[in-house]
């Protein structure tokens, strides 16, 4: 009987410790990355090339040789995953790792190579990018944004990134929150128009993941928008391709 009670005691404690999750943790540190930087701003007003994003200016020069630069990294971590955020690169989710395997499920690009892609010019691949305003990669996608970090009462942690969109005078915020007991993180976007004027803009996110032929996209909806704003069918397009399968995106 004593042996039975002892075994039950051990079993109950094993169940308790197995089901217990420590609080998520959040930290800041600097990491040296290889950088292909962009130039000083173009002194010619952007009114001559793209007046939709005035008063922003453009960056037109790009380095061919790399250098090293320290970037601030915000790390959110629980028992299951790590999430990395870069406030100096538009506040993007830089990458995410599943801890038991060490595999990335959000692509973390260790090389910051700016090239002429966004509305102001510089853009770099990888992670999850937040875009608000005019259709295109947001003007602040390659430059620092505001951020704060929080430890929440439920054991989760949050990093909130945000900025002002100058053409519309609107303000955007995105909270990246990591619960203590989930192998996933949440994003919660807020877009605030402090002006008395109604304005028609849009919000979109670009996410990067390591791509193989067996990659599939599980996302709701029955249509999508092209860069031009034209609506198309999802996931089966007009050519009969199932666009939710990466292997059928070979155009």
Question: Predicted segment positions?
Answer:
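Bacterial Sec-dependent N-terminal signal peptides
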Residues: 1-23
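A short, polar/charged loop/turn motif at coil->beta-strand junctions and beta-hairpin connectors
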Residues: 2, 20-21, 70, 153-155, ...
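A broad, low-specificity signal marking well-ordered, structured residues that form hydrophobic/aromatic
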Residues: 19, 74, 83, 94, ...
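Extended effector regions of multi-domain proteins
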Residues: 22-46, 51-57, 72, 78, ...
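N-terminal short leaders/motifs
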Residues: 22-43, 114, 122-143
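Polysaccharide-binding surfaces and accessory modules of carbohydrate-active proteins
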Residues: 23-27, 101-129, 149, 186, ...
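Extended, loop-rich substrate-binding clefts of extracytoplasmic carbohydrate-active enzymes
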Residues: 45-68, 73-77, 125-184
